[in-house]
Amino acid sequence: MKQIQDLTSIYARKKPAEFADNLCLFFCYNFCKGKIFKDEKEAFDAAEKARLDGFLGDDGFVLNAEAILREGNCFRWSVQKEKISAIGDVKKASPVCFEYNGRAHWVVVENGEIVFNSLENSVCVKNGKPVSMRIIRQLDL
C-alpha cells in the first residue's frame, strides 16, 4: 500500500515538485499529535493550509513546528532539536531524521522502532543513518 506522502504528490502538480517531496516532517508532527489523515486529499489540503499560514515554506519544509502541533487543538508545544546516532534510546514518539547520500527523510520512532513513515519505501531509512531528532513536549495539560 502506498503511504500518504507518496499519494499527496498528485495534488502538488501546480506547486514546485519538491513541495510534496519535503512534507515528511510535517506528516511526522501530525502523527505525533494524533492526527491521522483519512486520505491523501485531506493530507495535501492540510499541508497547503499550513503553507498559506506560514507554517511551511513553499518548498514543503517546516518553518514553525509549534504552530503545526497547535493546529486543531488548544495545547502549546515545545520542540527541541537533538543530534543522535541510533534510534534505540528513543522512547517517546519523536520525529527522527535519517540521512543518506546528501538526502534526508523523517520518520517517527517510539521505543526504538519506526512507528510511522510517510513513504512506503525510503532509501534514507533503508540505507542511511539517524542523525537528529525532535523532542516534542506538550506545555499545557
Range-by-range predicted roles:
Residues 33-140:
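Conserved active-site-adjacent core of cysteine acyl-enzyme catalytic domains
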Residues 1, 140-141:
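Short intrinsically disordered terminal tails
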Residues 1-55:
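Active-site-adjacent structural segments surrounding the nucleophilic cysteine of cysteine proteases
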